[in-house]
Curated annotation (Swiss-Prot):
EC number: 3.1.1.3
Entry GO terms, CC: extracellular region
InterPro entries: AB_hydrolase_1, AB_hydrolase_fold
Disulfide bonds: 234-314
Similarity comment: Belongs to the AB hydrolase superfamily. Pseudomonas lipase family.
Cofactor binding: number and manner: Binds 1 Ca(2+) ion per subunit.
Top EC group: hydrolase
UniProt cofactor(s): Ca(2+)
Keywords, sorted A to Z: Calcium, Disulfide bond, Hydrolase, Lipid degradation, Lipid metabolism, Metal-binding, Secreted, Signal
Protein name: Triacylglycerol lipase
PROSITE patterns noted in UniProt: LIPASE_SER (PS00120)
Binding site for Ca(2+): 286, 332, 336, 340
Subunit organization: Monomer.
Amino acid sequence: MARTMRSRVVAGAVACAMSIAPFAGTTAVMTLATTHAAMAATAPAAGYAATRYPIILVHGLSGTDKYAGVLEYWYGIQEDLQQNGATVYVANLSGFQSDDGPNGRGEQLLAYVKTVLAATGATKVNLVGHSQGGLSSRYVAAVAPDLVASVTTIGTPHRGSEFADFVQDVLAYDPTGLSSSVIAAFVNVFGILTSSSHNTNQDALAALQTLTTARAATYNQNYPSAGLGAPGSCQTGAPTETVGGNTHLLYSWAGTAIQPTLSVFGVTGATDTSTLPLVDPANVLDLSTLALFGTGTVMINRGSGQNDGLVSKCSALYGKVLSTSYKWNHLDEINQLLGVRGAYAEDPVAVIRTHANRLKLAGV
């Protein structure tokens, strides 16, 4: 049983890695062309997303600004925001690294924020982080509060990820202890090769530990935020925080496509609410759809409840929660893979565009 489960996890991890790689079939490209044409035909008025301060999009685990300098992490999102009047920058941090510490993603993001401010003449930025990018954004808001106007987190594991716990437990079964270092070495190379800048600052084991529920609790103690609810409550916190006299607007949303179903002999089933059963094209065109359904099922059986395949609803709650009802998996949240998503999934590009307008109306 344990061996079978581990095999499934390995298969799911391989599928996830493959899904992130820069490739697309002809059918997927045709679908994307149609989608972009429809978006252009219904585009809001110019200036709709013109926020007062620049927006910085912050990628999560395994990310970069453009994979191998070609495939955007935030697929089609930066362009859409720019077309609607926003000033948008995309951070390029270590794909595999912790958020704190001198080599951490937080310090990397802080340096990038200062670069953007120097280039634009702005005094603050709006940080929008996906997955681990939300934790990196919180770091900057904590250590340099005067540089931040708002923090928005999308599918961020503020309480850690049950799947990260699971992977850590599986690696602990190895009596030699070699598997962790060997796998980490391969993952680090993957991070270097896929980074647009071939960033060598990669530490897969540190990244894994950062995303566990235990380490997340420590991170929250070291970098507290009013946007967090009480530990274990599955509640969000305040919609704003004031740090050193600087007020930050705090927002979050998340996908919860993976929902628990019936339990049989102690094993809980799951369903992907984003797709048509069996026949949805996303199951074929986007390998991450089935992979994240598998990882989400593992999470449910570790008590996570509804999730996006990597982050639970409860873990994603932060600040003013705009929605936890999107029928998205973890990659749908950033319009991946290549804009392909399940038949019932909402348009993430439109959601982020609307949020930029929300920030504009809030005066930031």
